[in-house]
């Protein structure tokens, strides 16, 4: 069963900031593009089997089924909702 993957405004801002930091601060637009591509591709793969990554082990997040997916040096925090078949990406952090 396929899930719809959505990003919160905060997660979208995180992606923009990751790109900006690598492209501007580290002066590597090519690496910024590559990192953004890897993050986006991996996030979109959450449409299948979103439960495959571990549950965040602290309350109140554990009881809300918050999950953590590593991508390179980043962590993608998301919540799958099985009732409506959605995955909501909350944040992307270094």
Model-identified regions with their sequence ranges:
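Basic, Lys/Arg-enriched alpha-helical interface segments
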Residues: 1-65
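Enriched for short, Lys/Arg-rich terminal
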Residues: 26, 71-94
């Amino acid at each position: 069963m396929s899930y719809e993957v959505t990003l919160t405004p905060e997660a979208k801002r995180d992606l923009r900031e990751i790109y900006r930091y690598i492209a501007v601060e580290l002066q590597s637009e090519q690496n910024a593009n590559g990192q953004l591509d890897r993050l986006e591709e991996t996030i979109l793969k959450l449409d299948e089997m979103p439960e495959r990554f571990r549950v965040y082990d602290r309350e109140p997040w554990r009881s809300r089924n918050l999950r953590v997916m590593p991508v390179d040096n980043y962590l993608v925090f998301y919540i799958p909702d099985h009732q409506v078949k959605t995955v909501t990406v909350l944040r992307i952090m270094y």
